[in-house]
């Protein structure tokens, strides 16, 4: 098993087990029994493309990146369950309730959340999502089948559920639809290239990479100023109305992450930064007065790079270097 794959599985298992309140460190020896990142395989996606709809059982703790139909059936009381769904950056996710057999009066529940939430931290954050937090939940026990489908605002969504009675459960169908201007994204991969475009809309958009990475910005168009200026967090870009931030941290919520640098002025040409945090984010703040765009590449840091970084860094800064 490659070090990169172990790192991916390690992070995912920590994320999922935290739903049970288990904050202790997990040592992952092998991931043969539970292998959520197998579904991120491009080869698997190609092989299944001709066999849609894809069907399989849903686990109590699960992560899925493929459209299809998924059925959960409790074989014993399952009290702390969640399924994380992730699409391509340019996709919305729609969750459709096909069949639900749970006892709402007996304490069961089935809830969809627009985004991901873990240990009180949300993605997108409350600052970046168009809806207040309470409106991001859809509770089946309250709405029933009057609202059979829920569509996310970005490429991630999740389902919380609790089922007491063995044999009870539900079936859902996951579909994806194109998103012409994706705003908040969690990357499926540790490397890639993306252009975050905000066309004359007053909103904040974040691209989250749940890996330590090097980020290279090749183009930044903010529409209101010219030239390049890198300002330290103390100076800030808040007064400009349109700017890009690079953030680092250990959780999902961008509002709780550390501001490493902000970019207030458009430029062409590479600006590179190494961020050894568990989560690195490119975040664009837009006033709505301009067409803003930032194009960047990202690459996961190799283990040797991380080891070298650790020896020469302050831990709370996750080793940021521009």
Swiss-Prot record:
Disulfide bonds: 60-81, 104-141, 183-205, 237-264, 277-318
Record GO cellular component, one term: secondary lysosome
GO terms under biological process: behavioral response to ethanol; cellular response to calcium ion; cellular response to cAMP; cellular response to cocaine; cellular response to estradiol stimulus; cellular response to estrogen stimulus; cellular response to gonadotropin-releasing hormone; cellular response to immobilization stress
Xref: SUPFAM superfamilies: Spermadhesin, CUB domain
Places the protein is found: Secreted
Keywords in alphabetical order: Disulfide bond, Glycoprotein, Secreted, Signal
Pfam families according to UniProt: CRF-BP_C (PF23541), CRF-BP_N (PF05428)
Keyword Phosphoprotein attributed: no
Main location (coarse class): secreted
A molecular function GO annotation: peptide binding
Glycosylation sites: 204
Annotated InterPro entries: CRF-bd, CRF-BP_C, CRF-BP_N, Sperma_CUB_dom_sf
UniProt superkingdom: Eukaryota
Leader sequence residues: 1-24
The keyword Signal is assigned to this record: yes
Function summary: Binds CRF and inactivates it. May prevent inappropriate pituitary-adrenal stimulation in pregnancy.
Family: Belongs to the CRF-binding protein family.
Protein name as annotated: Corticotropin-releasing factor-binding protein
Organism of provenance: Rattus norvegicus
